[in-house]
From Swiss-Prot:
<keyword id="KW-0460">Magnesium</keyword>
<keyword id="KW-0808">Transferase</keyword>
<protein>
    <recommendedName>
        <fullName>Thiamine-phosphate synthase</fullName>
        <ecNumber>2.5.1.3</ecNumber>
    </recommendedName>
</protein>
<feature type="binding site">
    <location>
        <position position="113"/>
    </location>
    <ligand>
        <name>4-amino-2-methyl-5-(diphosphooxymethyl)pyrimidine</name>
    </ligand>
</feature>
<feature type="binding site">
    <location>
        <position position="76"/>
    </location>
    <ligand>
        <name>Mg(2+)</name>
    </ligand>
</feature>
<dbReference type="GO" id="GO:0004789">
    <property type="term" value="F:thiamine-phosphate diphosphorylase activity"/>
</dbReference>
<dbReference type="InterPro" id="IPR034291">
    <property type="entry name" value="TMP_synthase"/>
</dbReference>
<dbReference type="GO" id="GO:0005737">
    <property type="term" value="C:cytoplasm"/>
</dbReference>
<feature type="binding site">
    <location>
        <begin position="191"/>
        <end position="192"/>
    </location>
    <ligand>
        <name>2-[(2R,5Z)-2-carboxy-4-methylthiazol-5(2H)-ylidene]ethyl phosphate</name>
    </ligand>
</feature>
<dbReference type="GO" id="GO:0009228">
    <property type="term" value="P:thiamine biosynthetic process"/>
</dbReference>
<comment type="pathway">
    <text>Cofactor biosynthesis; thiamine diphosphate biosynthesis; thiamine phosphate from 4-amino-2-methyl-5-diphosphomethylpyrimidine and 4-methyl-5-(2-phosphoethyl)-thiazole: step 1/1.</text>
</comment>
<feature type="binding site">
    <location>
        <position position="75"/>
    </location>
    <ligand>
        <name>4-amino-2-methyl-5-(diphosphooxymethyl)pyrimidine</name>
    </ligand>
</feature>
<feature type="binding site">
    <location>
        <begin position="40"/>
        <end position="44"/>
    </location>
    <ligand>
        <name>4-amino-2-methyl-5-(diphosphooxymethyl)pyrimidine</name>
    </ligand>
</feature>
<dbReference type="InterPro" id="IPR036206">
    <property type="entry name" value="ThiamineP_synth_sf"/>
</dbReference>
<feature type="binding site">
    <location>
        <position position="142"/>
    </location>
    <ligand>
        <name>4-amino-2-methyl-5-(diphosphooxymethyl)pyrimidine</name>
    </ligand>
</feature>
<comment type="similarity">
    <text>Belongs to the thiamine-phosphate synthase family.</text>
</comment>
<feature type="binding site">
    <location>
        <position position="171"/>
    </location>
    <ligand>
        <name>2-[(2R,5Z)-2-carboxy-4-methylthiazol-5(2H)-ylidene]ethyl phosphate</name>
    </ligand>
</feature>
Length: 213
């Protein structure tokens, strides 16, 4: 069952997002120990694992998450999410329709990416537990990202739908979280701010501080 507090410190990562001197297992476990509230396995890029290699890694990371009672979300890959019985799935505007996904994931967390008012207007959010809004700031992690929309977009969506859980994404670090929180976001989702941090515990705790008041 979805709890909007899951969104507080939402870590997204794949093998291409971690430094060469670390494994994704090491990075994820450090983040889990520090207190991330949700994890999304996002295996993208030219060097992304596929097939059985991706399946094996997903199971290993899922097992890690469950040791810390943190839900494990799969990005885009519906068949993988079904095969490993993931806790949820996150899809974008160009991925499978949410209505169809909801038929398979009746008791799972469903997240959906929305970048602007046009996308919001044409999106059916009936089966969606939360939306990911962004990129808030310029981001190095997604080469196909939209133009940054700023924290103002979160405030706009919250005015339109106060009950809709929103997680901010894109270019977020510990120094630019405050405006996002002030805009009404339920949490922040980050990739490199955690995966490439020199001190993951300190970084995660700093993020957590913004949502513990």
């Amino acid at each position: 069952m979805f709890n909007q507090s899951y969104l507080n410190v939402y870590f997204i990562c794949g093998t291409s997002d971690v430094p060469s001197h670390r494994t994704i297992h090491e990075v994820l476990e450090a983040a889990l120990k520090a207190g991330i509230t949700l994890f999304q396995f996002r295996e993208k890029g030219e060097s992304a694992l596929k097939g059985n290699d991706k399946l094996v890694l997903a199971k290993e990371l899922q097992h890690l998450c469950h040791q810390y009672d943190v839900p494990f979300i799969v990005n885009d890959d519906v068949s993988l999410a079904k095969e490993i019985n993931a806790d949820g799935i996150h899809v974008g505007q160009d991925d499978a329709k949410v209505k169809e996904i909801a038929q398979y994931f009746t008791d799972k967390i469903i997240g959906f990416s929305i970048s602007d008012l046009d996308e919001y207007a044409k999106s059916d959010l009936t089966h969606v537990d939360y939306i990911g809004v962004g990129p808030i700031y310029p981001t190095p992690s997604k080469h196909d990202a939209h133009t940054p929309v700023g924290p103002e977009m979160i405030a706009t969506f919250k005015e339109m739908n106060p009950q809709l859980p929103i997680v901010a994404i894109g270019g977020i670090n510990t120094s630019n979280v405050a405006p996002i929180v002030e805009a009404g976001a339920n949490g922040i989702s980050v990739i490199s701010a955690i995966s490439k941090s020199e001190n993951i515990e300190k970084t995660v705790n700093r993020f957590k501080d913004f949502f513990n008041n």
